[in-house]
Design a protein with these regions (language model features):
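Mature extracytoplasmic enzyme cores
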Residues: 1-182
């Protein structure tokens, strides 16, 4: 770590893990969230959908070897792309656009049932961060067949395949084609 005087210095830090992810002390952001447990007896743990994602390399190699749009779609089924959308077209005029990346499998039903307590709904409303009740076994992320644990599978991610046209507009990712809204 760079020091104020320009010299480097070694900084040690202990990271704590739980079955839900890395435990965080958010006291530097808001004093009430500091310490373990917090004022209301909770602990914050952050789950990273890509923490154990080593599938990306396989995904990109398969993209590079693809001979058709079907090959591209088959490659995406690994759910290896960490965070970006996929857009592709073939020589026959068929196009594809999808958000086939590592996305936590938190259905709206799970969010409605498991975002609880005085803080979690506020975090969701203000920061769009889903904070599930880790004390309830019914509040675990879901699993899709053929997908890595706790992630949405290929069949449940937004995507469209079309012959007319497709567009990628990051802030309007759900609108690649007005006839095929995501």
């Amino acid at each position: 770590v760079s020091a104020v005087d320009g010299d480097g210095q070694t900084v040690e830090h202990t990271f704590y893990q739980s079955q839900f992810g890395t435990i965080a002390d958010l006291g530097s952001q808001l004093e009430a969230f500091g310490g373990w447990p917090t004022f209301n007896g909770t602990v914050f743990a952050f789950n990273d959908a890509n923490k154990e994602n080593l599938r990306g390399l396989e995904n990109w190699i398969n993209f590079g070897q693809a001979q058709s749009l079907d090959d591209i779609l088959e490659a995406t089924k690994t759910i290896g792309v960490p965070w970006v959308n996929t857009i592709a077209a073939d020589r026959n005029g068929e196009g594809f656009y999808g958000d086939i990346s590592a996305v936590p499998n938190a259905s709206q039903q799970l969010i409605d049932a498991c975002v609880r307590g005085p803080i979690a709904p506020l975090i969701l409303a203000v920061a769009s961060i889903v904070t599930l009740d880790g004390t309830d076994p019914d509040c675990q992320l879901g699993n899709d067949e053929g997908a890595p644990p706790n992630l949405l599978g290929f069949d449940n991610v937004p995507k469209v395949r079309a012959t007319e046209y497709g567009a990628n507009a990051n802030d309007s990712y759900w609108l690649p084609n007005p006839r095929n809204l995501l």
